[in-house]
Curated annotation (Swiss-Prot):
One Pfam family, short name: Methyltransf_16
Chain positions recorded as S-adenosyl-L-methionine binding sites: W51, G87, S88, G89, D115, W143, A169
BP terms from Gene Ontology: methylation
Gene name, Swiss-Prot/TrEMBL: EFM6
HAMAP family attached to this UniProt entry: Methyltr_EFM6 (MF_03198)
GO cellular component: cytoplasm
Primary location class: cytoplasm
Name of the protein: Protein-lysine N-methyltransferase EFM6
Single Gene Ontology MF annotation: protein methyltransferase activity
Family: Belongs to the class I-like SAM-binding methyltransferase superfamily. METTL21 family. EFM6 subfamily.
Cellular localisation: Cytoplasm
Protein's job: S-adenosyl-L-methionine-dependent protein-lysine N-methyltransferase that methylates elongation factor 1-alpha (TEF1 and TEF2) at 'Lys-390'.
Amino acid sequence: MESIFGGFGDLVVPRPKEHLGQTDLSFGGKLLPALKICEDGGESGCGGKVWIAGELLCEYILEKSVDHLLSKTVNGTKQFKKVLELGSGTGLVGLCVGLLEKNTFHDGTKVYVTDIDKLIPLLKRNIELDEVQYEVLARELWWGEPLSADFSPQEGAMQANNVDLVLAADCVYLEEAFPLLEKTLLDLTHCINPPVILMAYKKRRKADKHFFNKIKRNFDVLEITDFSKFEHYLKERTHLFQLIRK
């Protein structure tokens, strides 16, 4: 995968140095103690900073977390047990879920924050910073590659161990990676009871629509609008979708 993903850093404009150091995020007091995120100023590429789509997804999760994470809005009454964030970068969204789990004393839910190898040290640093080592685990995951045993869907008695919630924020940014991301989403949902997929995305280029047009062959793409800051994020051209495997 080095040959495919090795150019990620070269293809992305370096991040401004103001995205360096620790940021505390409480999302208007919805998350206390505040989430602590270390940004690396672009040292690890585009993943080493907080992006607006990640903030949107956190806002939605915190607003809709009644009794348990999102259970009242996207999954009936079922408790999510295995959460996977794709392209985690700093780990913002996954760490938000993990800290929410820790603060509300829900037992048994594991959150996996995943990205390419060069971002794993930053993910681990933020996990330690927020003291969610029990709730959140960092794993290397290359889009387009076969899924590891941790994430590959199982059937029968083993399906209870499957990922049941997939989170992705600002993963649609590099056109060369579109087919790889699509393959990973297809692999994760290749089962009788596929996971819920929530994808937040900031519209930047016309090319981005090619990704959504292509995945509509295998997924219904539903825009989520029923949250308090919808209009705010709409002005920022940032959207939230649920992807449902056909």
